[in-house]
């Protein structure tokens, strides 16, 4: 039997807008006793932290699995030199069913109830295991900047072919370059490859002395759009696999009995002007946060990164996760989410909502001024957004799924409007049509109501001329109340986390459109009209979030916000 480990890549953006899942604050800082006991001889909670600080944001990143939080207070400062924070805490939630129909969940919040994640890579020997010494060794971050790599590469001497490196300037190599965590410990059955690096000679060994370097795509050679544009007409774009997933080069692969599958180098390479890289897992100890009896066997390579720019990107931070299933079983009905607790200055006067078209969750002030409190924002209060803009790759179907549905286009705009996108023989050029997609929003939702093509609304890589590279955007936006006993309150066990991942309340009830989404007596609540996106305002012009039971018109015609629900601005 051939065993493989599968990979998923996720990319999240966090941005502050001046002038995933949301949570509140009543129990923050209150230590609760875990119902499930961690084992002392196994991994302890990660103690490491680092700071993303290259632009106008100063954000704490923890090795324990969450971020923006130091165990008691918020550490996401915008502006970086101020004392106001826009975020409180965030972490990954992942859950699915194994072949025996057993639920497996890995999720974390503040860590007050316990832990589900620990530092370090897992083994690739079909056991997906880790011990305390490995967790402790990897309880740290690796911080690098694009500028120091560019400076190092600028000192290379090349052969006549202008490609082969024949000399380097060692004085240009920083400690971060010299000590890059490119490899796991194969003697301990870890993967041969961990942090991405550019391999000059293809020998599968990180040798900075020979011109290898932490892999920023400096030339754009991995960019799918660039590669596609340079291919001969009719050619198929084939993405470059990661070293682990590259089974053609005998120097690559995991170095263990469990092969890797599905990883793409364009997703794995380093991003940003400043990058924090680290690796963590869900097998280091008992899951005392989610209380999941069954761990998954996930190895997660993470990046936190940011850019220095003169525009809004200077107020943004980004997060990329390469999620690898090191176990030998396949999870089905699997869901991924970024759990986020935003506190915009003063935590007691906030609202949340989402923009379905943009795939964006956001938090905004419920009053004209923020506060009171020393951490409140002065003047016109800002808003903060969280964009889950590159989710998991969708299952392949052999198509370049369209961004614009031509049948819906003809119904709304008429066939003649398509003529501008036809080639000399009358065929529609999907790339040209995609380039103008924002002119034709009514045609984003397919006339067939195909659930796959509908994901083009806020997914990415639709109609780009490349087959099977489509990725999910935001498919749910939910919140829960700060009540550990209510059915729309805080999660307490694995089934609660899994229900929230699927857009279902703790008691299994579907979220409904309007009001608070749960209670029939709340203002605007519409029983039986199920909703995937809570508080979308008027952004779901297609009624996509209510289409599962044929109620598209509700989302198109009835605004839904925390204000229309009669909620009070709070945490």
Describe every region a protein language model picked out:
Residues 2-3, 18, 569-570:
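Short intrinsically disordered, low-complexity coil segments enriched in acidic
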Residues 6, 20-24:
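N-terminal cationic amphipathic segment used for targeting or macromolecule association
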Residues 1-11:
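Bacterial N-terminal signal peptides that target proteins for export
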